[in-house]
UniProtKB/Swiss-Prot annotation:
Pfam families: MtrC
GO cellular component: a single term: plasma membrane
Compartments, as annotated in UniProt: Cell membrane
Keywords: Cell membrane, Membrane, Methanogenesis, Methyltransferase, One-carbon metabolism, Transferase, Translocase, Transmembrane, Transmembrane helix
Enzyme Commission number(s): 7.2.1.4
Gene Ontology process terms (BP): methanogenesis, from carbon dioxide; methylation; one-carbon metabolic process
Name the record gives this protein: Tetrahydromethanopterin S-methyltransferase subunit C
Organism: Methanosarcina acetivorans (strain ATCC 35395 / DSM 2834 / JCM 12185 / C2A)
Oligomer status and interactors: The complex is composed of 8 subunits; MtrA, MtrB, MtrC, MtrD, MtrE, MtrF, MtrG and MtrH.
Transmembrane segments: 19-39, 40-60, 75-95, 96-116, 131-151, 162-182, 221-241
Function text: Part of a complex that catalyzes the formation of methyl-coenzyme M and tetrahydromethanopterin from coenzyme M and methyl-tetrahydromethanopterin. This is an energy-conserving, sodium-ion translocating step.
Length: 267
């Protein structure tokens, strides 16, 4: 079951502007590198998606700290919903500037939804408008970045053929949404820390790179797919160990419980 945050502004860690810069600049840089470099280096699109996913998870952390309840998963899903619309629109009309056009379109969509959430629905969260702009932008970059991993390019026709028409877009929607919504959901509470939360975002984003790496084998070949998977596994292992270290740091005690007792032992 999901729960909201503590009912106020998220505290501690890197300032939002720093995470935003990492997500937006890193996301776009990875997408363009993955597009222009040979297919073997399409994992750069995945690295861009990781940057964007961390940004999205931090935005969810900040807005959900005001208390969204079961809206924590919902806001992650809406980020990818906005992202798909903005990504396909921008790539279809923007040409080489497609990712940038998509990013701008996402910001506009996010702003509209943020205003509706606060002014019409009356959620009353001070940063809702800004957070929805950030979450929409991050979701869009995640969609495009993971599409580059699979298709090797952000060319609209190839993305439609190799990502949308065969249904991989649904896969990206789920794994991208989980990477944005799950980190705060897994760490929420009065002792939530930004570094612990965002380490989960990196870990989930690495899993997304691994999964899309497998999907890329059908179009890009085994060498490119192998590199995508290898990079994802390395990042996942690093992020998981960082997360485990943060858990031990923040826990009162880490103990082994052993195996669950059998029915006979409980009698």
């Amino acid at each position: 079951m999901s729960a909201g945050g503590a009912g106020g502004e998220a505290k501690g860690g890197f300032p939002p502007q720093t995470i935003m810069a990492i997500g937006a600049i890193g996301g776009l840089a990875g997408i363009y590198l993955g597009n222009f470099m040979p297919a073997q280096f399409s994992f750069f699109g995945g690295l861009g998606a990781i940057c964007a996913m961390v940004w999205g998870a931090d935005a969810v952390r900040r807005v959900a700290s005001y208390g969204l309840g079961t809206g924590v998963p919902s806001i992650g899903m809406i980020s990818l919903g906005m992202g798909i619309v903005a990504a396909l629109f921008g790539l279809s009309v923007g040409g080489i500037a497609g990712p940038i056009v998509s990013f701008i379109a996402a910001a506009i969509i996010g702003a509209v939804i943020g205003v509706l959430a606060n002014k019409v629905i009356g959620m009353g969260i001070p940063i809702m408008e800004q957070a929805m702009v950030e979450i929409a932008g991050a979701g869009t970059l995640v969609i495009i970045g993971l599409s580059v991993v699979i298709a090797g390019t952000f060319d609209y026709a190839e993305v439609v053929e190799y990502v949308v028409a065969n249904g991989y877009i649904a896969l990206i929607f789920i794994i991208g949404g989980m990477g944005i919504l799950h980190p705060f959901n897994a760490n929420l509470g009065p002792d939530e820390k930004q570094d612990r939360t965002l380490s989960v975002a990196v870990e989930k984003a690495a899993i997304a790179l691994i999964i899309t790496g497998f999907a890329s084998s059908l179009h890009e070949g085994l060498m490119a797919a192998g590199l995508n998977i290898a990079v994802g596994v390395i990042i996942w292992a690093w992020a998981f160990m960082k997360y485990y270290g943060y858990v031990k740091r923040d826990s009162y005690a880490v103990v082994g419980t052993g195996l669950l007792p059998s029915a006979e032992e409980l009698e």
